[in-house]
Amino acid sequence: MVKPLPRLRLQGFNNLTKALSFNIYDVCYARTEEERQRYIEYIDEQYDADRLTQILTDVAEIIGANILNIARQDYDPQGASVTILISEEPVIDKKQAGKELISDAVVAHMDKSHITVHTYPETHPQEGIATFRADIDVATCGVISPLKALNYLIESLESDIVIMDYRVRGFTRDVKGKKHYIDHKINSIQHFLAKNVKSRYEMFDVNVYQENIFHTKMHLKDFDLDQYLFEERAKNLSFKERMKIETLLKREIEELFHGRNLSE
């Protein structure tokens, strides 16, 4: 739960911008070119624009935002994108329901409060590795906090590796004229994760407190080969095959987690 600082009396609107960025990876091994293609098709179907729209709509509800507009697109040969514009307050007076309106709130929030997701399925040309990356951004202005959606997003996607960045920008001014550059307590993104999530992942932080920048990356603690095989079971493989595939997968996970290629 996001713990606010003692309530401030503000001069006008809360102008703080809070941005949460996710990169979520699913890693898989598919033995043949045909299996790798079926993996891409499976991911493309599982995370098409309709499914992603539902996930982001749920995020908007969780953080207490109002949806202004939704744009979504499936791509050929694969991938999808969804963008939802949101606001802190309802933008249409109930008395005006059914009438065509151009709300000032829409213009005011279009470049500040939004939720976006883009998907990137891909495969290794020779080694059988296939990955899926979901790139998610939740940016809000005002008192709405994107941190409330952390656990839901991790549980909604096949999250072998999660890389998160959170930053607060701008300032809000109280009635005495003093500027405040953050309006809630935070030492680490980890503090906003549920216990059952933290128990499953190894986590690592890089935080720049004086700049209100917080970075956490994590990967699953337990390695179960069956969870990474596509259309195959570990028991059907020879010991040598299992060791080879396990080595490839662990290397891929480590490289994605650290964001760099390891030396041979």
From Swiss-Prot:
Superkingdom of origin organism: Bacteria
Gene3D superfamilies in the cross-refs: S-adenosylmethionine decarboxylase
Family the UniProt entry places it in: Belongs to the prokaryotic AdoMetDC family. Type 2 subfamily.
Gene: speD
Task of the protein: Catalyzes the decarboxylation of S-adenosylmethionine to S-adenosylmethioninamine (dcAdoMet), the propylamine donor required for the synthesis of the polyamines spermine and spermidine from the diamine putrescine.
Catalytic residue list: 113, 118, 141
Provenance organism: Xanthomonas campestris pv. campestris (strain ATCC 33913 / DSM 3586 / NCPPB 528 / LMG 568 / P 25)
Keywords: Autocatalytic cleavage, Decarboxylase, Lyase, Polyamine biosynthesis, Pyruvate, S-adenosyl-L-methionine, Schiff base, Spermidine biosynthesis, Zymogen
Name the record gives this protein: S-adenosylmethionine decarboxylase proenzyme
